[in-house]
């Protein structure tokens, strides 16, 4: 973690009482801003807070919502990987295998190294995905995080995040990028490399392994060469 950083949770002290989206204010538990290393090379962007994130304030955190792994009002397929793995086995497990998350750290306060986690939107409605207007309302938060962190690699997690990030940071039209084909590949963007990821809750074991292998290969390269190495 950056030597001058005091906290991993909402390190830029963004508005934790934001009311830009009235409908989401009625359904959220917590305003979920970014979490992690402000000197990170790798910035992960999801669509919206998970159920666990809404509870803890930490993006991508998730817990089993019940005996079948679901949360109220959502389809079982949204909370289990194919084959029955729960969503709590998702992104964190991948980061642990890459050496980017301390395996002994608490589920709701992961100790991340060189990683920052955030979302397109900061609040959750458990019954629906965010609207385009809600994503636009939250865009200044995301833009500020990307600008202040200045990562080397953006990892859009899921179809919606890929479309938004590709539109903003690449010259490739979003309609030309299908997540199934872009998963576990590197896309050169404007100032950033993109490595798209299917939501870990929806990945097959083969897709998870493919993404891990591709990202490990990327980490072994001089991926910082376009911006120069920064002191951490």
Annotate the PLM regions:
Residues 2-232:
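A polyanion-binding, active-site-adjacent surface
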